[in-house]
Amino acid sequence: MKPLKIIFAGTPDFAARHLQALLTSEHEVIAVYTQPDRPAGRGQKLTPSPVKSLALEHQIPVYQPKSLRKEEAQQELAALGADIMVVVAYGLILPKVVLDTPRLGCINVHGSILPRWRGAAPIQRALWAGDTETGVTIMQMDVGLDTGDMLLKTHLPIEDDDTSASLYEKLAGQGPAALLDALAALSEGTLSAEKQDEALANYAEKLSKEEARLDFAKPAKNLWQEVRAFNPWPVSYFEHQGQTIKVWQTSVLAEPSTKASGTIVAAGKQGIDIATADGMLRIHKMQLPGKKPMDVADILNSRGDWFTPGTLLASPEASE
């Protein structure tokens, strides 16, 4: 395999793990592009991205343009003479002139099996939709949103106890190895590109805090999927006793309830059972305002009066 001269573009920890894999490979990372430093923490101090911090540790030149649309930034990138540009959760749009600059173009690591779940939140949307499988796609970038030809795909079963946090970790483990495999095949000219089937494409829009509100008029299975998708952010919740109560862990009880949706059917050490449109949702772990996430059994010790059987939890429509 002929080592490649690589420009790496990425910003968060997920991207940094891929950069780390490249740094320990035979390839040469000649430059790193990342988002400008952002205010963070209580003091709102300007803080470098995880990718920038890693690049500086390895004395790699770092570029932080606010945009790659300006000719000056494009000429600066072209002057680096890279064979290929690897893009992982960078956060800036790459114009066509940039995509066409490296000899082998630009490739991207995406956290889904394309063309399903193009866009910003593929891990979360896969969980919420009840998908049984996800994975990583290495694709050749074009000007569309995750529409480029697919070069390599990995597959990962979604387990019942997976959350967005656990899937993120699993895909962050799969991605770097897949990237190195794709680069090796590209270097040797043995990789064939596969067009995406537009008929199978859908989009994973960013999650919003508004979406995180639980509606017990939905089936229990849907709510269980939702809670897993919104863990660790923005975390599913419901309003009760004038408080926002976050829900971290649930399970589905298949037995039907004759109670109205949102009614607390039982509350004890096992959890709080709530009637839904189909089946019951058992809440195992919650978080009261100003508190840490706790097992329901511990919350009932101090707030059992809030969750007595027969209590009706208001639906979003009723409380607006």
Swiss-Prot record:
Function noted in UniProt: Attaches a formyl group to the free amino group of methionyl-tRNA(fMet). The formyl group appears to play a dual role in the initiator identity of N-formylmethionyl-tRNA by promoting its recognition by IF2 and preventing the misappropriation of this tRNA by the elongation apparatus.
NCBIfam families: fmt
Gene name for this UniProt entry: fmt
Family: Belongs to the Fmt family.
Reaction(s) the record says it catalyses: L-methionyl-tRNA(fMet) + (6R)-10-formyltetrahydrofolate = N-formyl-L-methionyl-tRNA(fMet) + (6S)-5,6,7,8-tetrahydrofolate + H(+)
Keyword Nucleotide-binding: no
Upper lineage: Bacteria, Pseudomonadati, Pseudomonadota, Gammaproteobacteria, Alteromonadales
Gene Ontology MF term list: methionyl-tRNA formyltransferase activity
Residues reported in the UniProt entry to bind (6S)-5,6,7,8-tetrahydrofolate: 112-115
Keywords: Protein biosynthesis, Transferase
PROSITE patterns tied to this protein: GART
Protein name: Methionyl-tRNA formyltransferase
Keyword Transferase tagged: yes
Gene Ontology CC annotations of this record: cytosol
Record EC number: 2.1.2.9
